[in-house]
Amino acid sequence: MKKILITGFEPFGNDKINPALEAVKLIAGRKLNGGEIVICQVPVVRYKSIETVKQAIEEQQPYAVITVGQASGRAAITPERIAINVDDFRIPDNEGIQVIDEPVVAGGPDAYFTTLPIKAMVSEIQAQGIPATVSNTAGTFVCNHLFYGIQHYLKDTNVRHGFVHIPLLPEQSVDGSQPTMKLEQIAEGLAIAAQAIIDNDSDIQQGAGTIC
């Protein structure tokens, strides 16, 4: 039985809710074909985010980890391709920390690629009628910080990891200015992604690039 650890961030900024946390709560304990989902709540705090997930990994000993965060402006579930070694926070984190152009890990590589089968994940999510696409930027806030930090932590292990950004919930954009997705659809997309990880030891060959 392969455990898939899926983490969700707490609310941050002016939001009272974070769809990442709410979605993972909905699928906590879900049984998969050959696996199960376990979850972890993550603080939107620079170094505490990494330490929290590291502790969950040590406790759960998962086969793979999906770290999840919200991304305003996105209309689809978007597995991230790459994490970069830069913290450049546009807003403070939840403890008031706001850093500019500092490394996530001093002396670390410029970037890490995901070790999840992101194209297979996207394909399986799309097959169920849920919008999904590969993303080539995880930003420079705590989402990318966590993505990079956990990739660095797991680099010499067989534990697979990657980050997935998800849209806002309808209640987070009552004026309709931002694309949204229903909570149940987000949760189901994450569960499908978890199953795709179990089913695919390597990624599929399928175009997912962009011009810019």
From Swiss-Prot:
PROSITE patterns the record matches: PYRASE_CYS
EC number(s) given by UniProt: 3.4.19.3
Name listed for the protein in its UniProt record: Pyrrolidone-carboxylate peptidase
Family of this protein: Belongs to the peptidase C15 family.
Ribosomal protein found in the keyword field: no
GO cellular component, as recorded: cytosol
Job description of the protein: Removes 5-oxoproline from various penultimate amino acid residues except L-proline.
Catalytic activity annotation: Release of an N-terminal pyroglutamyl group from a polypeptide, the second amino acid generally not being Pro
One of the GO BP terms on file: proteolysis
Active-site residue numbers: 80, 143, 165
Known partners and oligomeric status: Homotetramer.
Subcellular location: Cytoplasm
Molecular-function GO term, any one: pyroglutamyl-peptidase activity
